[in-house]
């Protein structure tokens, strides 16, 4: 056991040892490195697999009662300041590497096929291995300095991976947006670290947590200063975990390759902020204002992300807002003191969301064979439908992930989400209501995504098939009856004839009106020239892309069991309740309850999940009981005819335009900073530079004048004498005349 703890540093070193030679080889020997790209991928997967086995070993040691182990190595020995590196092994540390390595391996296996024809294949795997190494280094860090170093490395790798396709302007802008937004949180984190070093004189967790609480309790330090430092510390997780108001980078980060979304934005990077808050939980718990701030930030983020996902037409963006909402649940749990649930939900969510992202990648991969390489079309759910017929394995695994996120028992997310909702009710009825509302919205939009993508009939191959206009409400239009030219132009076009006004591969009005329930309905015709060379239907992905989805599907089915102890008559968690704590023992107590009480408490949340799923089925499901249209557009309109159109449009526009937050940020901050920069430029050019330039010009003229006056020529001296004599005489004459 002691030997295992002594060599824990190997866990992050293994993926690092894959990243360095791949990156160096791609720079020094690019052609040879690209020629061996599959070998490099195999090496990366193998080394991360060894790290995974070591992580499982550490986890087993901890849950069986292993001791907390810390190893420190000093950079320099100094009386006043001695920076240290090392690692800390405790139950919290031991559980995070499992999530990172298992999802990381699945993503690497998946990426080997997904990125096989990409020119940046080798570079992609170098960044991927470096990211895994950085994340593993972060979770075993014993002090704030080391955490900050790996925190920045994780952010840098995220920036590089999001911008993997940097030749696309949207991807380049997305990685810059992610980088700049995270700079705000990271700067706050740095100031908070320095502030608590001022309070405690140490960066080590074991000393810092105890010393800071003692200082606050004994009033040795101002509570305002401690609260300010804690707030600055919390800014880091707010940005990294995409919490409101620094969440705006996450949806745009979907411009990167889909496997990156599965790894960074499902299992690891988003969970890094949750890990840091959990690590510093005793410190935050001593400050009631910060705990309230954490809980409300999480609650607002959970509800905001859920509402923004309601009408997304882009498959990956819908999952991105889902990730934002679920990370809000985790922060909400930490703010309410539900420490166990807050660390249980990242585990269950990681496997479920990674499964969904990999499934979406398979869908996009297959849709590209129909619509070409165009993210606006291959990711658009309006062009999908019926994919479960052509991709049964992907459809089944996607359904498993959907049911899990909806909170349907016995899937993984049910066990953790239900506990968060229950604890939120105990903490605050308002927060409990927010959590349940977000759960209902989650079940609705996840079911909507599944029905639009996998049920019904494939819509991309429709030929002159009229569809009632109300079905386009998934784009969140301003009015349900009309489209402007601009709005029509913003709709995704089918392949073949871009920017065409004829009936060749574009959305257009058919020009006919029909009555339905006494209401005129305008039709939209999807016309698609079915070229003989185009494959008519999508195909199932290759085995190397299906295997990770199947493995993650098994995790989604059974990972929830680690939070449940099947003792007769009661439900508790030996692993999570008894061992998943820090050594400070200041955390929220989770008392066991019997099975009957548990299921009674779970009835409201499960009922909400089933109700929301049923509503999504009615609106977007494949079954048509009363009408001949196979696409259920008529039924959808008739079900909604009692709801005011204005109210529906408000909901759709709120979701489609991201709650108007991006627009507000763009007008207030982006445009404001640009205007300030322009004014600063003008002031610098015309005032600062103008004064300096004019002083120089004045000196030039004075010098030129003196040159002629002191040139040694008699005529110049005579001219100067006469000029100044005339000026003198005129001055005297004017003075006498005035008097």
Swiss-Prot record:
Reactions mediated catalytically: a plastoquinone + NADH + (n+1) H(+)(in) = a plastoquinol + NAD(+) + n H(+)(out); a plastoquinone + NADPH + (n+1) H(+)(in) = a plastoquinol + NADP(+) + n H(+)(out)
Transmembrane feature ranges: 9-29, 39-59, 89-109, 124-144, 147-167, 184-204, 224-244, 258-278, 286-306, 325-344, 395-415, 425-445, 547-567, 603-623, 718-738
Subcellular locations according to the entry: Plastid, Chloroplast thylakoid membrane
Gene Ontology molecular-function annotations: NADH dehydrogenase (ubiquinone) activity; quinone binding
Cross-referenced NCBIfam families: NDH_I_L, PRK06590.1
Subunit comment: NDH is composed of at least 16 different subunits, 5 of which are encoded in the nucleus.
Family statement drawn from the similarity comment of this UniProt entry: Belongs to the complex I subunit 5 family.
Protein name per its UniProtKB record: NAD(P)H-quinone oxidoreductase subunit 5, chloroplastic
């Amino acid at each position: 056991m002691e030997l295992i703890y002594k060599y824990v540093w190997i866990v992050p070193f293994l993926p690092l040892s894959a990243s360095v030679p791949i990156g160096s080889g791609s720079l020094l020997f690019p052609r040879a490195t690209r020629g061996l790209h599959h070998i490099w991928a195999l090496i990366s997967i193998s080394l991360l697999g060894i790290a995974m086995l070591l992580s499982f070993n550490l986890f087993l040691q901890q849950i069986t009662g292993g001791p907390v182990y810390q190893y420190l190595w000093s950079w320099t020995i100094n009386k006043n300041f001695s920076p240290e590196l090392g690692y800390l092994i405790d139950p919290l540390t031991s559980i995070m590497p499992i999530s990172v390595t298992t999802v990381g391996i699945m993503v690497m296996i998946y990426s080997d096929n997904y990125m096989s024809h990409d020119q940046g294949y080798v570079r992609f795997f170098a960044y991927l291995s470096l990211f895994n190494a950085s994340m593993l280094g972060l979770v075993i860090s014993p002090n704030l300095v080391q955490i900050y170093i790996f925190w920045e490395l994780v952010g840098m790798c995220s920036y590089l991976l999001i911008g993997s396709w940097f030749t696309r302007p949207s991807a380049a802008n997305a990685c810059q947006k992610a980088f700049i937004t995270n700079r705000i949180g990271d700067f706050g984190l740095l100031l908070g670290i320095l502030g608590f070093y001022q309070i405690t004189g140490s960066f080590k967790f074991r000393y810092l947590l105890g010393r800071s609480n003692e200082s606050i309790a004994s009033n040795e330090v101002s509570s305002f200063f401690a609260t300010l430092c804690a707030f600055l510390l919390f800014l880091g997780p707010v940005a990294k975990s995409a919490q409101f108001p620094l969440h705006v980078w996450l949806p745009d980060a979907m411009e990167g390759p889909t496997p990156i979304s599965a790894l960074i934005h499902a299992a690891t990077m988003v969970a890094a902020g949750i890990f840091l808050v959990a690590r510093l939980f005793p410190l935050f718990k001593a400050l009631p204002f910060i705990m309230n701030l954490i809980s409300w930030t999480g609650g607002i983020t959970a509800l905001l992300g859920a509402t923004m996902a309601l009408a997304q037409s882009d498959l990956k963006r819908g999952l991105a807002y889902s990730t934002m909402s679920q990370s809000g649940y985790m922060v909400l749990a930490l703010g309410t003191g539900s420490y166990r649930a807050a660390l249980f939900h990242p585990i269950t969510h990681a496997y479920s969301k990674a499964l969904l992202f990999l499934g979406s990648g398979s869908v996009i991969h297959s849709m590209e064979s129909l619509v070409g390489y165009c993210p606006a079309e291959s990711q658009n759910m309006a062009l999908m439908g019926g994919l479960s017929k052509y991709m049964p394995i992907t459809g089944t695994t996607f359904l498993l992930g959907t049911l899990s996120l909806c909170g349907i028992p016995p899937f993984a997310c049910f066990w953790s989400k239900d506990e968060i909702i229950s604890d939120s009710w105990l903490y605050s009825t308002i927060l409990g209501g927010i959590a349940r509302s977000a759960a209902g919205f989650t079940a609705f939009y996840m079911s909507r995504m599944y029905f639009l993508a996998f049920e019904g009939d494939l819509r991309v191959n429709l030929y002159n098939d009229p569809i009632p206009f109300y079905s386009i409400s998934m784009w969140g239009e301003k009015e349900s009856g009309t489209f402007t030219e601009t709005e029509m132009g913003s709709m995704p076009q089918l392949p073949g004839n871009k920017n065409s006004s004829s009936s060749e591969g574009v959305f257009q009005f058919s020009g006919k009106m029909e009555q339905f329930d006494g209401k005129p309905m305008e039709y939209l015709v999807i016309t698609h020239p079915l070229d003989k060379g185009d494959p008519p239907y999508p195909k199932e992905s290759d085995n190397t892309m299906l295997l990770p989805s199947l493995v993650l599907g098994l995790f989604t089915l059974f990972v929830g069991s680690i939070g449940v102890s099947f003792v007769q008559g009661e439900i508790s968690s030996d692993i999570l309740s008894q061992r998943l704590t820090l050594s400070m023992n200041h955390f929220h107590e989770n008392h066991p309850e019997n099975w009957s009480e548990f299921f009674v408490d779970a009835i409201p949340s499960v009922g909400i999940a089933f109700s929301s799923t049923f509503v999504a089925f009615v609106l977007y499901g494949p079954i048509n009981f009363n009408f001949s249209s196979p696409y259920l557009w008529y039924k959808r309109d008739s079900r909604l005819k009692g709801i005011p159109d204005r109210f529906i449009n408000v909901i759709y526009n709120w979701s489609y335009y991201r709650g108007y937050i991006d627009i507000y940020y763009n007008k207030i901050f982006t445009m404001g900073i640009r205007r300030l920069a322009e004014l600063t430029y003008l002031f610098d050019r015309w005032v600062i530079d103008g004064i300096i330039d004019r002083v120089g010009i004045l000196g030039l003229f004075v010098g030129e004048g003196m040159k002629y006056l002191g040139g040694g020529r008699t005529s110049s001296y005579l001219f100067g004498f006469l000029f100044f004599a005339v000026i003198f005489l005129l001055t005297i004459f004017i003075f006498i005349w005035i008097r």
